């Protein structure tokens, strides 16, 4: 019976060890499950925080872009208003230029009385002054520039008249600030 008791004790101690091991494994498994659950619970919180931060960054970027776009729109609008203001008299100037040409032709006629000539000169001068106040000026005719002159005829160049010099002006050209209203019609030495 002593052998039986030894075997029973041994078996009992082995089964207690197995139970302890099982219990330890269960405790470890439970702790691991709890830890995993805690981590899983923490992950969504971090994800929600990260998502909120990402959305905040996205909204901030959208705001900054919209703000920059508004500034660009305001700048372009201001530039357009300035351009409109600067060139507001362009159509009027183009309409007046033929009248100015007619006054020039009338003054070139021979046999005008002094009073008529003086009246035409005063009218011409007042038109020119009004156009100058709006920024309209005559195109210079020193040498030929295809940006401001239209060659209607060419003459052969010689020693006295170098190439690209202007021989005669048929019609004066005008510009409004830097914008050409009408090119000067000229005869050019070529």
Swiss-Prot record:
Can you name a GO cellular component term? Answer: cytoplasm
A Pfam family annotated for this chain is GrpE
Q: Where in the cell is it found?
A: Cytoplasm
Q: Which domain of life is it from?
A: Bacteria
Major localisation: cytoplasm
Which SUPFAM superfamilies does the record cross-reference, listed alphabetically? Coiled-coil domain of nucleotide exchange factor GrpE, Head domain of nucleotide exchange factor GrpE
Q: Which cysteines are joined by disulfide bonds?
A: none
InterPro entries registered for this protein in UniProt? GrpE, GrpE_coiled_coil, GrpE_head
One example GO MF annotation: protein-folding chaperone binding
- List UniProt keywords, sorted A-Z: Chaperone, Cytoplasm, Stress response
UniProt function note: Participates actively in the response to hyperosmotic and heat shock by preventing the aggregation of stress-denatured proteins, in association with DnaK and GrpE. It is the nucleotide exchange factor for DnaK and may function as a thermosensor. Unfolded proteins bind initially to DnaJ; upon interaction with the DnaJ-bound protein, DnaK hydrolyzes its bound ATP, resulting in the formation of a stable complex. GrpE releases ADP from DnaK; ATP binding to DnaK triggers the release of the substrate protein, thus completing the reaction cycle.
- Quaternary structure, from the entry: Homodimer.
Q: Return the similarity comment.
A: Belongs to the GrpE family.
What HAMAP family does this protein map onto? Answer: GrpE
State what protein this is by name.
Protein GrpE
Q: Which organism is it from?
A: Streptococcus agalactiae serotype V (strain ATCC BAA-611 / 2603 V/R)
